[in-house]
Amino acid sequence: MAGLLLCGALLIGGCGGVLSPDLFIVQRSGNVPGAKLTMLVNEEGVVHCDNGPARRLSDPQIIEARTIQEDLEEPAAKHESLPAKPGSVLSYYLRDANGTVRFSDNSPHQPTAMRKLAGFVLNVAQGVCGLPQQGA
């Protein structure tokens, strides 16, 4: 009887569509057409752009997303916010389990991970989610 209960519990857990934890959510804003974007990326490589349908990242993109998230753990835990310089076009807000990060495309002293995040967001928005190029 105990074995049947265990098997039943395993079946229910497997059929319930267990949701993978989110790696991060990014909100991009700016003063050009198409700048506004919300992107949610989960641990299994599923991405949603602007609450659209679930899309699948490639394996290299999943690795890139995880690397970016890991590299931003410390800045997020410190709730790092880098001010924009005059002439900024795009701003980014990232939230993950560790905290938040804010920066703009021209914020001075950006760590490499922030520049990688901006590139990742652009590439995934256009290549995976099929969104038009911002400013177009």
Residue ranges of each PLM-predicted region?
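Sec-dependent bacterial lipoprotein signal peptides
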Residues: M1-G13
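Short, well-ordered, aromatic-rich surface patches in folded extracellular/luminal domains
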Residues: G16-L23, Q27-S29, A77-A136
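Mature extracytoplasmic domains of secretory-pathway proteins
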Residues: P53-A84
